[in-house]
């Protein structure tokens, strides 16, 4: 645990970390509001809102992650392989779109759909993270601590499930308000 704290406290530009955090929070707020629209209306509207929710969610998660990566100072020159970097963005968008779709379309009132949808989001974010990290090019070797890798994947899965549960559970009042506005 100290390795993670030390890395964050001493090897990251705090201003960029704060910017990344603000982008993440704005993205989540926007995504939850868009997801509320995806849960009401006709099928064609739902599909469009789910796609847009996935693009906004995946894009903001990716931007948060990439800005945080840029804030890291490993004290050696760093580059990023463009194809893997772009693939990591596509993974984030695809996973969040699929996760939100599963949570809303398969059965919006079923606990299982929220859990599976959240699991897809969480594991997709983990895949985006490790794909993005694989895009890093440095004059040296990057090594992975498997305990941290496994912990990150498990945390991503759990937080994904919690996030989708909260996003869907919070829809009741928003749906009423949005329904009145339509």
Where are these regions (language model features)?
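Alpha-helical transmembrane segments and their helix-helix packing motifs
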Residues: 1-182
């Amino acid at each position: 645990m100290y390795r993670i704290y030390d890395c964050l406290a001493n090897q990251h530009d705090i201003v960029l970390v704060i910017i990344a955090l603000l982008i993440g929070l704005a993205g989540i707020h926007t995504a939850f509001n868009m997801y509320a629209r995806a849960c009401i209306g006709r099928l064609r509207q739902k599909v469009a809102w789910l796609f847009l929710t996935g693009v906004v969610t995946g894009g903001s998660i990716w931007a948060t992650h990439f800005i945080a990566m840029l804030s890291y100072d490993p004290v050696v020159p760093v580059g990023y392989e463009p194809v893997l970097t772009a693939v990591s963005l596509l993974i984030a968008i695809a996973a969040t779109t699929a996760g939100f779709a599963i949570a809303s379309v398969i059965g919006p009132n079923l606990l299982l759909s929220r859990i599976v949808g959240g699991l897809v989001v969480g594991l997709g974010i983990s895949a985006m993270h490790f794909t993005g990290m694989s895009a890093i090019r440095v004059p040296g070797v990057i090594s992975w601590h498997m305990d941290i890798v496994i912990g990150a994947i498990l945390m991503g899965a759990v937080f994904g499930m919690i996030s989708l549960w909260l996003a869907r559970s919070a829809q009741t009042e928003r749906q009423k308000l949005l329904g009145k506005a339509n």
